[in-house]
A protein has these predicted regions:
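Mid-domain alpha/beta scaffold segments of enzyme catalytic cores
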Residues: 1-255
């Protein structure tokens, strides 16, 4: 099994223990994600220490204030590291106001350019205020205009109304623990519609622990619970979904 999106540096417990617990649960590859200068460096360092860990580097939209050419150059430099396999997470977050929409747009556009130059996938964060779709709609428009052939991962997929649009574009949809919540049946139904070669699973740890662990701090080992729910709604065995997401991650991240 794989975890396509985690934040090891933010999880409770030691890094070695988290990686060992994941391996014991059958999780043998994970992508740990940077969000700012400090967590980018930590993600790369974790990837250097562990064979099973790979990194993504970028600037989260909530951290987009102050994004400039120097920040972009630093991300591009880290992006060339042999264990960095994606740029991000980046995108738009209109739920919080830690950075203005224009600051987020500048950072997003710059990171699409970096991903294009490096030939790396881009990890997309999207969050809207309840009942709105302006962020995800603008993300689609921006990627359509700028991303070209860059592989796109819609992390913590939360736009079931756009699952068909994502499939048409060949983008990857990665499902997190919130897809297991009783109130999120629309996400499970969306997971059933994603093409076999474009589905991924993730934890987004330490956030969004799947239902059996809800209320606890999430960790990569718990991705198996999300995978079980996704397998069930897709009408396949856990083992078949495991083979599918492992193959998809291998094709995407080259690990």
């Amino acid at each position: 099994m794989i975890d396509s999106h985690t934040h090891l540096v933010l999880c409770d417990g030691g890094e070695d223990e988290l990686v060992a617990a994941a391996a014991a649960a059958g999780v043998h590859r994970m992508l740990t994600i940077g969000m700012d200068q400090e967590t980018n460096a930590a993600a790369v360092a974790a990837a250097e220490r562990h064979e099973s860990v790979f990194a993504a580097v970028g600037r989260h939209p909530n951290e987009a204030s102050g994004f400039d050419d120097a920040v972009a150059a630093e991300i591009a430099e880290l992006g060339a590291h042999e264990k960095v396999r994606a740029i991000g997470e980046t995108g738009l977050d209109f739920y919080r106001d830690y950075a203005t929409p224009d600051e987020q747009r500048r950072a997003f556009a710059a990171q699409i350019e970096i991903a294009t130059e490096l030939g790396l996938p881009i990890v997309i964060h999207s969050r809207d205020p309840e009942g709105e779709t302006s962020a995800i709609d603008e993300i689609f428009e921006t990627l359509d205009a700028r991303a070209g052939e860059v592989p796109v991962i819609l992390h913590c997929f939360s736009a079931p109304q756009r699952v068909g649009d994502a499939a048409e574009r060949g983008w990857y949809c990665s499902f997190a623990g919130n897809a297991t919540y009783p109130s999120a049946k629309d996400l499970l139904f969306a997971a059933a519609k994603v093409p076999e070669d474009r589905i991924l699973v993730e934890t987004d740890a330490p956030y969004l622990a799947p239902q059996p662990y809800r209320g606890k701090r999430n960790q990569p080992a718990y991705v198996v619970e999300t995978a079980r729910e996704i397998a069930a709604v897709r009408g396949v065995s856990y083992e078949e979904l495991e083979r599918t997401v492992e193959a998809n991650a291998q094709a995407l991240f080259g690990w």
